[in-house]
Amino acid sequence: MNCYLILTVALLLTSAMTGTTTAGQLNKKGVTLREDDRFPCNAGNCACLPLDSYSYTCQSPTSSTANCEGNECRSEADW
């Protein structure tokens, strides 16, 4: 019993100390990292990859793209 407890605690500490996140976890902006070819936004919006982030944000196609990488906001058709 004690062996299992020690092993569990060791695994939890190792996981906590690495600071890694698993695929699919949300970032601060609430959009998951791109894992596959699914479009991350609702219909009618476009996906912007901000210059200071690794995750897409969803915005209206008429919004400014000045903060988007490549100055573009990708539509579902262009995804």
Curated annotation (Swiss-Prot):
Keywords: Disulfide bond, Neurotoxin, Secreted, Signal, Toxin. Expressed by the venom duct. Its main location: secreted. Disulfide bonds join C41-C58, C46-C68, C48-C73. It is found in: Secreted. Residues 1-23 form the signal peptide. One of its GO terms (molecular function) is toxin activity. It comes from the Eukaryota. GO terms for cellular component: extracellular region. Residues 24-37 form a propeptide. The cysteine framework is IX (C-C-C-C-C-C). This is Conotoxin Cl9.3. It comes from Californiconus californicus.
